[in-house]
Amino acid sequence: MAKHYVYIVKCKDNSLYTGYTTNVEARIATHNAGKGAKYTKTRRPVVLVYQEMFSSKSEAMRREYEIKTFSRQQKLKMIEER
């Protein structure tokens, strides 16, 4: 069964980007190749700072949506406590 991940990367400009994937390593490589999300294209390189694993896509997508509503400070606290 496929694993589903929500991840946060720290961009070159120190901003945070939250995303969903089934392969974290490949997705980070895609972001760093400039072929990922439009947001990260001009903010490379990106560094993985957080990830959570889920057994279903729907769980992961719900969590991604939740994290995207968090303030920067909430995300930083979550990263720090991981």
Curated annotation (Swiss-Prot):
<feature type="domain" description="GIY-YIG">
    <location>
        <begin position="2"/>
        <end position="77"/>
    </location>
</feature>
<protein>
    <recommendedName>
        <fullName>UPF0213 protein SH2523</fullName>
    </recommendedName>
</protein>
<dbReference type="Pfam" id="PF01541">
    <property type="entry name" value="GIY-YIG"/>
</dbReference>
<dbReference type="InterPro" id="IPR035901">
    <property type="entry name" value="GIY-YIG_endonuc_sf"/>
</dbReference>
<dbReference type="InterPro" id="IPR050190">
    <property type="entry name" value="UPF0213_domain"/>
</dbReference>
<comment type="similarity">
    <text>Belongs to the UPF0213 family.</text>
</comment>
<dbReference type="InterPro" id="IPR000305">
    <property type="entry name" value="GIY-YIG_endonuc"/>
</dbReference>
